[in-house]
Amino acid sequence: DQQRCIELLNVLADATSGQSEIFDSNIFSKLISNERGSLVIAEENKIILGMASISFNLALRYNGEYCQLEELVVDQDARGKNVGGLLIQEAINLAKKRGCKEFGLYLLESTKHNQPFYEKYGFVKIGAEMRQSL
């Protein structure tokens, strides 16, 4: 259910930036139909509890693709039930099946408290990221 996923993404935007964003359904459609990304959905009784979006990127340093976690969000009522863990595990499995050399993610200042969660699934901190808004 695209609408439910967009609702969850807006919850994530509010939690990470303090601003509620309206995600573009056209971008969502491109993500699920494009070979450069994928969505992993967790549902129970046809209710979406959470989602993870991942992108697949080419890099010379890997002589192939690597995977990037773009968003991971779990409904407030489903937290503490390992939904996030199951989403991460499935995203990692998708990346492995695709032949990705590495799986990465970024922790923002507002999400760095999640570092122990990701460490449970084998992620290690490797440095700082730099960015420029365009």
Task: Describe the residue ranges of each PLM region.
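Alpha-helical interaction/dimerization surfaces of two-component signaling modules
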Residues: 8-12, 94, 117, 121
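Acetyl-CoA-dependent GNAT
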Residues: 3, 7-64, 70, 133
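Residue-level recognition of the GNAT/N-acetyltransferase active site
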Residues: 57, 75, 108
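Conserved beta-strand-loop-alpha-helix junction that forms the acyl-donor binding cleft
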Residues: 104-114, 131-134
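Conserved GNAT acetyl-CoA-binding A-motif
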Residues: 88, 95-107
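Conserved acetyl-CoA-binding loop-helix of GNAT-fold acetyltransferases
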Residues: 71-74, 80-93, 120
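Conserved acetyl-CoA binding element of GNAT-fold acetyltransferases
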Residues: 64-76, 128
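Conserved acetyl-CoA-binding loop of GNAT-fold acetyltransferases
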Residues: 100, 118-128
